[in-house]
A protein has these predicted regions:
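Short, low-complexity disordered leader/linker segments with a strong preference
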Residues: 1-11
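Short, polar/charged alpha-helical segment
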Residues: 21-46, 70, 160, 164
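Pocket-lining segment of extracytoplasmic ligand-binding domains
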Residues: 161-163, 172-203
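Charged, often glycine-rich, active-site loop that binds/positions anionic groups
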Residues: 54-66
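Extracytoplasmic "Venus flytrap"
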Residues: 13-30, 50-55, 200
Length: 203
């Protein structure tokens, strides 16, 4: 209700894997604004993009949350799966046929599943948002069939599922922090990447 007397003054840290302009950071800052407003300014959440609290390492970022090094976090399930591999289920390709179906699952049984898995690691699940279905971009050629992926060096997040999928399709997957992707494509270290359109635009 925003009555400041009802809330203890406190500063919290929120770790985010995305860049400053990525939807992860935008959502995190909006969340921080809402908390500040509704606590009468007593609860301040400082948002740290690019996993700066963990030296740019997203795996360490989620580990810090689990041990209390960061108070809050906004991470993709493929990153959270470094804590609990069973969370990779949502990153399996072609699991959903539409945004509506994905939203319905995540808002009900899927969210309950996440909450249980994360609670076992000492993390409280507050909710979710999405970056959109993933789209492939690359600097070499159009990809319209699985065969077109053969030999392409594709950046993937640090996820066993993504590594396995792209290897199976004949690509050469490389795990890399998102903040390094644009430069890596320019330098030819990788040929491309796959993400939701909003994430790709943020590069």
């Amino acid at each position: 209700d925003g009555e400041s007397g009802k809330y203890q003054k406190i500063n919290l840290s929120m770790a985010v894997n995305g860049t400053d302009t990525q939807i992860d950071s935008l959502v995190a800052r909006h969340f921080a604004d809402l908390v500040s407003e509704r606590s009468g300014g007593n609860i301040v959440i400082d948002v740290f993009s690019n996993d700066t609290l963990a030296g740019g390492n997203s795996t360490k970022g989620v580990e810090y949350i689990a041990v209390g090094g960061s108070d809050l976090g906004a991470y993709a399930t493929c990153v959270l799966a470094n804590l609990e591999p069973k969370l990779s289920v949502a990153t399996l390709p072609w699991s959903f046929t539409s945004y509506q179906q994905a939203r319905e699952v995540i808002d009900t049984t899927g969210g309950e599943y996440y909450a249980e898995m994360l609670a076992n690691k000492g993390i409280t699940y507050l909710g979710s948002f999405h970056n959109g279905f993933r789209q492939l971009t690359n600097s070499k050629h159009a990809v319209t069939t699985p065969e077109d992926l053969k030999g392409l060096k594709i950046r993937v997040p640090g996820s066993a599922v993504y590594m396995g999928v792209f290897k199976a399709l004949g690509a050469s997957p490389t795990a890399m922090s998102w903040s390094e992707v644009f430069t890596a494509i320019q330098q030819g270290t990788i040929d491309g990447q796959e993400n939701g359109c909003s994430v790709t635009k943020s590069a």
